[in-house]
């Protein structure tokens, strides 16, 4: 360690939820809750306005028998901890915003109400606890960090009220992270400086609006834009034509050509423009560089009549389609970043297979699931949610599972959740019971704690167990927030085994190719929220769970409907955070499976309107998508199609003074035979 940092290590430091025994709430205003809003000013171009209101702060004093008896913890709803190791842990607000291309970012502090709080006068003579580094799930924390210089200076820490971090371009949106610091701390005077009713302007200078609009016209897609719609004020919203067929690119080894035929036909039938590149073709090649160049060329300059790709599927194991070798893990991320900023510009996945026998089950399970040809779909109303064993981190594992069940996986949403919390009761036999539930059929599996590349640590569920599963025709999405379960450069990791299994296993698998972290995994699923056993919902800080559901009044624009969206949506929750390991999460987390596959939890939520003649006013609604085939609207009737997701049209005729109204939260995909005859009309809302 460089001694110039003046950071001292104290051995065997463990932060546990039980360390703090007393708490004091200090009211700061008459408000009942904190507010942190970023809005666009309609009358001022290139300016956003930030408004911060603090209702109270909470001080938690340490159990005097603990090693941490010299410290107190400061918290406030919606404010989050930092990871500046050794410096005072003064929580901050953090939010993602949209920025115009080429713009530089500056700030104007318009005003605030200042309040000084003397902690000693409130009975707190201890220092505020120092921030600690993010902890990997593969390590045992045994060091305590304190920056002696930071604690010996007679000045307010966090004096910079606002900071900006440029993240990059996510397909059609340039995003950045704004960090607001309304609380400052002087460790010598033992005082807090509160900046309440804080008002700030974020000013964009040198914005290239024409370039921004061009980017949106070319690349804007609701599936991507919607992921950030919840927390990004849209400075420019250029409407692209919604009559567009989505481009789906497959990169495969030639030996899989005949096996892929039904999958390609299936995707084409759903309305995708499918492009297939084989690695023996000169413009594709077998190296990471050549494949990346091939994909980037399609993204930058798609063939005539094609939109830039939205989905990309790699078909083959690393011997067929190599992955990028990072210092400590493999990553497919860089196949899908076309702007050089480490953010993906398409949704992506991999069918990992070395031979046809490994590939065919993945194709068959995907087509069956997407076509809803299972004889019994009721299993989709079941979920397995597992908090794995770690006796010092139950606040993370149980907190994540509790959030999932309290908010979403419950009877209010017609879901039966099989939950496994820690500690495991005597004779509960979690491991056997979990496998039994999966055999009976579940639509969603989520595990958080420790893994190896071979599977879950405790409760045990390993690669060798997958061969004994019996969940034929009852496949679901498995999401694993743990280390190495998707370490796909080895012969066969847990995620690959789950996907390759014939007539059993998973239809999609999300997991990491390296060691994950406690805070970041929690945020990936729950959102950027304070870790607790029962975290509350926060509309400003959405995680993967929130983005799959809509029971808290979220706009449909922010839902994650597909497996590829969920992967990106979870990583965006980490991107919003104060973590220093955001790039690791983009690199490590992978989807084994079809990125375009819609996630079905509980009700299928897909409306099929087929072989119908509409002679009276009719409305068809769906909370995901509508498939329309061979429909005639006549006799002056109005047919209204309302979908949260996409509308797919294969054969529609509107005649005899009739009307068709299309209201899609996603895209309207005209696949074939769209005929609106003279005297009739159609409308897009």
Predicted regions and their residues:
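Extracellular pro-sequences of secreted precursors
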Residues: 21-280, 287-311
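Catalytic-core segments of thiol-dependent peptidases
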Residues: 296-328, 389-390, 396-492
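Extracellular beta-helix/beta-solenoid repeat scaffolds
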Residues: 131, 136-138, 147-148, 607-685
């Amino acid at each position: 360690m460089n001694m110039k940092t003046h950071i001292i290590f104290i051995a065997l430091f463990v932060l546990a939820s039980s360390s703090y025994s007393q708490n004091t709430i200090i009211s700061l205003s008459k408000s009942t809750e904190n507010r942190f809003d970023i809005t666009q000013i309609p009358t001022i171009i290139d300016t956003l306005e930030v408004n911060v209101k603090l209702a109270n702060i909470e001080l938690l004093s340490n159990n005097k028998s603990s090693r941490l008896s010299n410290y107190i913890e400061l918290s406030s709803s919606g404010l989050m901890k930092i990871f500046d190791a050794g410096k005072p842990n003064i929580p901050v607000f953090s939010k993602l915003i949209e920025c115009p291309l080429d713009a530089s970012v500056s700030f104007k502090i318009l005003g605030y109400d200042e309040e000084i709080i003397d902690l000693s006068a409130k009975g707190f003579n201890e220092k505020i606890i120092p921030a600690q580094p993010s902890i990997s799930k593969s390590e045992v924390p045994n060091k305590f960090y304190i920056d002696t210089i930071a604690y010996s200076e007679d000045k307010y820490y966090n004096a910079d009220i606002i900071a900006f971090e440029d993240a990059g371009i996510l397909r059609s949106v340039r995003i950045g992270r704004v960090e607001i610091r309304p609380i400052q701390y002087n460790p010598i005077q033992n005082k807090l400086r509160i900046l309440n009713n804080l008002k700030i302007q974020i000013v964009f200078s040198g914005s290239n609006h024409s370039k921004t609009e061009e980017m949106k016209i070319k690349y804007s897609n609701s599936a991507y834009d919607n992921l950030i719609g919840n927390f990004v004020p849209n400075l420019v919203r250029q409407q692209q034509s919604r009559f567009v067929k989505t481009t789906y690119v497959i990169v495969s080894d030639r030996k899989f050509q005949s096996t892929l035929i039904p999958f390609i036909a299936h995707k084409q039938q759903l309305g995708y423009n499918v492009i297939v590149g084989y690695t023996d073709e000169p413009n594709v090649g077998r190296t990471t560089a050549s494949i990346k160049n091939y994909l980037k060329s399609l993204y930058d300059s798609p063939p005539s009549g094609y939109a830039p790709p939205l989905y990309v599927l790699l078909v083959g194991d690393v011997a067929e389609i190599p992955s990028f070798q990072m210092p400590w893990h493999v990553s497919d991320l860089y196949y899908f970043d076309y702007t050089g900023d480490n953010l993906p510009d398409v949704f992506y996945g991999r069918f990992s297979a070395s031979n046809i026998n490994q590939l065919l089950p993945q194709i068959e399970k995907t087509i069956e699931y997407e076509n809803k040809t299972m004889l019994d779909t009721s299993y989709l109303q079941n979920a397995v949610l597992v908090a794995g064993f770690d006796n010092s981190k139950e606040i993370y594992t149980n907190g994540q599972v509790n959030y999932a069940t309290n908010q979403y996986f419950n009877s209010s949403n017609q879901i039966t959740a099989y939950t496994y919390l820690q500690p495991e009761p005597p004779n509960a036999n979690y491991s056997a019971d979990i496998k039994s539930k999966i055999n009976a059929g579940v639509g969603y599996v989520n595990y958080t704690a420790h893994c190896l590349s071979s599977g879950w640590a405790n409760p045990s569920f390993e690669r060798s167990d997958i061969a004994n599963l019996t969940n034929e025709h009852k496949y679901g999405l498995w999401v694993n927030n743990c280390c190495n379960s998707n370490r796909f450069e080895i012969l066969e990791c847990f995620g690959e085994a789950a996907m390759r299994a014939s007539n059993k296993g998973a239809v999609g698998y999300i997991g990491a190719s390296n060691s994950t972290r406690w805070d970041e995994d929690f945020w990936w699923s729950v959102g950027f929220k304070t870790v607790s056993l029962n975290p509350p919902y926060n509309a400003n800080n959405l995680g993967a769970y929130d983005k799959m559901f809509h029971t808290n009044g979220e706009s449909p624009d922010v839902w994650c409907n597909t497996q590829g969206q969920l992967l990106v949506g979870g990583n965006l929750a980490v991107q919003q955070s104060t973590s220093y390991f955001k790039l690791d999460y983009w690199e490590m987390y992978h989807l084994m499976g079809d990125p375009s596959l819609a996630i079905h939890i509980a009700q299928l939520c897909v409306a099929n309107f087929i072989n119908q003649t509409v002679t009276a006013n009719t409305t068809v609604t769906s909370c995901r998508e509508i498939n329309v085939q061979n429909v005639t609207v006549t006799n002056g009737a109005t047919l209204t199609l309302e979908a949260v997701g996409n509308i797919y049209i294969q054969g529609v005729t509107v005649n005899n003074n009739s009307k068709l109204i299309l209201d899609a939260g996603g895209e309207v995909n005209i696949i074939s035979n769209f005929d609106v005859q003279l005297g009739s009309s159609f409308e897009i809302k």
